[in-house]
Amino acid sequence: MRWTLAAVYGLLLAATLPASTAAAAGNPRIVIVGAGVAGVTAASSLYRAGLTNITVLEASQRIGGRIRTSAFGGAGPVELGAQWCHGEGGNVAYEMASVFPGLLKTSMFTENDFLVQSNGQRVPEEISDRLWELAQSIVESTARDRNTGTLGDFVTTRYRSKIRSDPEYSDINRQLAEQFLVSFHNSERGHYAYDSWYDVAASTDDDYVETEGEQALAWTGRRGFSSILDIITGSFPGSTKSLVPIHQLTKFNKVVSNIRWRGTTDGYVKVTTEDGSLYNADHVIVTVSLGVLKATSRAMFTPALPTINQNAIDGINFGTVNKVFMFFDAPIPAGFGNVVNLLWFDRDLQALRQSKHAWAEAVGFFYRIDSKPYVLCAWLNGAQGRQAELLSDATIQEGLLYLLSLFGRNYKFGNVQSILRSKWSSDRFIRGSYSSRSITTERLETGPNNLARPLRDAANEPQVMFAGEAASATHYSTVHGAMETAQREATRLINLYK
């Protein structure tokens, strides 16, 4: 390229111009807060479109956010965060990954899903299938739309009525039916990351759209789910995408403490971090978790966020699910099941609640991990799952082995060699797992679209934008939902500078 004096002068001028002028010159300064999958997707989309003046501020020392593939001794990598690719058609993560043969496969999680009682007895498949179908039909019933109570009231009332009066279920023991209802509630708590279905309105306006195809696709290879980050940035082996230097664009250990988005003398958005660093930006894309926004939004934004955004932050639920992986010195017994849902006899549950293992009521189910025959994972839900984060590894291991002594008493397990677990609620930079709707969401008449409303300047141009799974109306709680919102906000800026 031949550099003329005018061209050099133009570059120097762009570096010193007020924000609006520099942006008009096609050289906008863009700050992205957070280097989870939404931040990485936004940065990559912008960079490939020629908007390369990007700074990603990441509070931790790693890229990925709630995608956290971790080494687990001799077992290989496991997923402390996002576990499966949910769906195929209409899933941007699947569409990117499916280019690479063998990277995704149907998880063993989808089969050999058992109901097991605390005396170690497995519920016959013919009965378990009918109980699952009944509960799911109630949850998916359109009658919910006309109900003014909680989801818990709606489900329990209809379920018990069916069990009591419908001849189809006359052969099912009432005690077993109640055990299943408790277990189903725990399963739903894990699925939607709420503490209780009594915190959710029966008539909740849930716009979630399930993508087509298999809903539990496991990631293969040593990078596991983290492969999607490499695919997005073009660093995955065999990728044909241009490489985005995401690590060069990212500044680590940068905890954003304030975003001044209006009233600055030079027109820039001012982003301040806890270490005193200041970053000027024409545009900011905030991709931190909803949990972080709930904890910090009132102090983070100057002036305060518009009510429509703040109500969304306050109203959308952000709950916690955790995983504990156990690595045994022998394979998990073959007949144990790929997924084991826990059904408690009342006497056993009362004994648990009065013991030092009371926190273990948080465990909704155990499940095997694809291609890891020596590993078993426990899925922990709700308030007790958060409590468990504060306990030692030894205490957690002892409690889980106590559960296996009940529910797996008919099988011989090896010795636990090590455990690895997530602590999403107590992670200062995450503060939970994923979003869902609650009674508060309905009361405030809010939702993801309100959270995603951009903060605009006097010229009605977007200054601060929001991306992440909680900002997706149709695919919240998923990686592909987070990616879609990041593409949405990146496209907003790309179109602005065409």
Protein language model annotation of sequence segments:
Residues 3-498:
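FAD-dinucleotide binding site
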